[in-house]
C-alpha cells in the first residue's frame, strides 16, 4: 500500500546540530553497484567478480526514497543529489527523478555519475526534472583513464555522455580527484577541456574515505598547489565559497572552477549535508563509522511524524567534524566505504 504523506507534520523550528549547523543537503545513494573499479572507491581486489552486492529487495524502493525526501524537506533540506555506486545502473532512475522533482521544497536536484551510461539517459533525466549533473573525470589520457577506472570503458564514451548531457540542457560539473604522481600532470588538460566546453571543473583533494582505498597523505595534492598550477597559465580571481567548494573565476571571463579542500582546509564547521545509503542508513558525515537505519523505521509501519522525529533527533545530536580532527583520535577506526555512502 502506498504510504500517505502527512501534509501537516510539524518540523522542528530551525533544526540545528550540536555545532549549530542546519540540514540543507541530502545525498542519496540508489545502488552500491558500479561498472568502474576506481582504487580510491571500489578497488578490484576487494570488489571483484565474487563480491556480493546488495540484493534488490534490500534496496529502498523509489516510493520509500521519495517518502524520506518529503521528511527531509520538512526538516529544511532543499538540495538533493543522487549518487551510487553508479546511479545510472539503477533501472528506471528517471522515474525516481520525477518523483523527487515534484516534492515541494526541493529546489535543486542533481546527479553524480561516472558518465559511462549517460548518453542513453540524459534526455530522459532532463525530462523528468533533473537540474544539474556532475561527472567524475580523473584523466583525459585514454590509457591512464582506463587504468584509473580499472575498466574497459573508454574515456571517449564518458566524453560522449558529457556532450549528451550538455546538449540536453544540463549544466555540467566535472569532478577530478588529483593524486600526486598519478594524474596531477593532466590537470591543465582537464582545465582546458572544461573551459572549451563551458563546464565547471572541480579539483578534489584525495581523501581518506573508508579503510580500503590505500590513502596516504603523501599522495594528496593540496588545493593551493593545484590552484597555483592553474593560475600560472590561466589567472584566477576568487568568487567565494559554495557548499564544499572554493570558487574561482578565470580572469579572462571564460567560466570558473572550484577546489574542494577536505584535507588541507576542512569545512566541517559549515557542513549541512546528510547521506542516505541505498539500504536506507542515514549518515551524518562522509567519514562516519555507523549510520541510523531508516529502512527499519519505514518498514515497521512508522508514520511520517515518527520518521520526522527520528531524522530530526539524529541530526540534532550530530557532532561530526572528522576532517578537523584527522590524525588525532581517528587512526585505525573502521569507517564506511565511499561506494556505500555515495561519496
Model-predicted regions and their roles:
Residues 2-25, 192-196, 206-343:
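Auxiliary Fe-S-binding modules of radical SAM enzymes
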Residues 2-84, 88-107:
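Conserved alpha-helical substructure of the radical SAM core
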Residues 36, 142-143, 266, 292:
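Glycine-centered loop/turn positions within well-structured domains
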Residues 37, 41, 143, 148, ...:
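Residues that scaffold the ATP/ADP-binding catalytic core of kinase and kinase-like folds
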Residues 48-52, 119, 141-149, 210-214, ...:
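A short acidic, helix-capping loop that chelates divalent metal ions and anchors anionic groups
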Residues 59-81, 89-202:
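Radical SAM/AdoMet-radical enzyme domain recognition
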Amino acid at each position: 500500500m502506498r504510504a500517505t504523506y502527512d501534509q501537516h507534520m510539524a518540523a522542528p523550528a530551525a533544526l540545528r546540530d550540536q555545532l549549530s549547523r542546519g540540514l540543507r543537503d541530502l545525498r542519496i545513494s540508489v545502488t552500491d553497484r558500479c561498472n568502474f573499479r576506481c582504487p580510491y572507491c571500489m578497488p578490484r581486489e576487494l570488489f571483484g567478480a565474487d563480491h556480493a552486492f546488495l540484493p534488490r529487495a534490500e534496496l529502498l524502493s523509489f516510493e520509500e526514497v521519495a517518502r524520506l525526501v518529503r521528511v527531509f524537506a520538512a526538516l529544511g533540506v532543499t538540495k538533493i543529489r543522487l549518487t551510487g555506486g553508479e546511479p545510472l545502473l539503477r533501472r528506471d532512475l528517471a522515474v525516481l527523478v520525477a518523483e523527487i522533482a515534484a516534492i515541494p521544497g526541493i529546489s535543486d536536484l542533481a546527479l553524480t555519475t561516472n558518465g559511462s551510461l549517460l548518453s542513453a539517459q540524459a534526455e530522459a533525466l532532463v525530462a523528468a526534472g533533473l537540474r544539474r549533473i556532475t561527472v567524475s573525470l580523473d584523466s583525459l589520457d585514454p590509457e591512464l583513464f582506463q587504468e584509473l577506472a580499472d575498466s574497459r570503458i573508454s574515456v571517449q564514451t564518458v566524453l560522449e555522455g558529457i556532450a549528451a548531457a550538455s546538449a540536453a540542457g544540463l549544466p555540467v560539473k566535472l569532478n577530478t580527484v588529483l593524486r600526486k604522481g598519478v594524474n596531477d600532470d593532466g590537470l591543465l588538460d582537464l582545465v582546458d577541456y572544461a573551459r572549451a566546453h563551458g563546464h565547471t571543473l572541480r579539483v578534489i583533494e584525495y581523501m581518506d574515505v573508508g579503510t580500503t582505498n590505500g590513502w596516504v597523505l603523501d599522495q594528496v595534492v593540496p588545493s593551493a598547489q593545484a590552484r597555483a598550477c592553474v593560475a600560472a597559465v590561466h589567472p584566477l580571481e576568487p568568487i567565494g565559497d559554495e557548499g564544499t567548494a572554493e570558487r574561482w573565476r578565470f580572469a579572462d571571463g571564460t567560466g570558473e572552477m572550484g577546489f574542494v579542500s577536505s584535507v588541507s582546509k576542512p569545512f566541517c564547521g559549515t557542513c549541512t549535508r546528510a547521506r542516505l545509503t541505498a539500504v536506507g542508513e542515514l549518515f551524518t558525515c562522509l567519514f562516519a563509522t555507523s549510520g541510523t537505519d531508516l529502512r527499519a523505521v519505514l518498514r515497521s509501519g512508522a508514520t511520517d511524524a515518527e520518521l520526522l522525529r527520528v531524522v530530526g533527533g539524529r541530526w540534532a545530536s550530530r557532532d561530526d567534524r572528522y576532517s578537523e580532527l584527522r590524525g588525532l583520535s581517528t587512526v585505525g577506526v573502521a569507517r564506511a566505504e565511499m561506494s556505500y555512502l555515495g561519496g
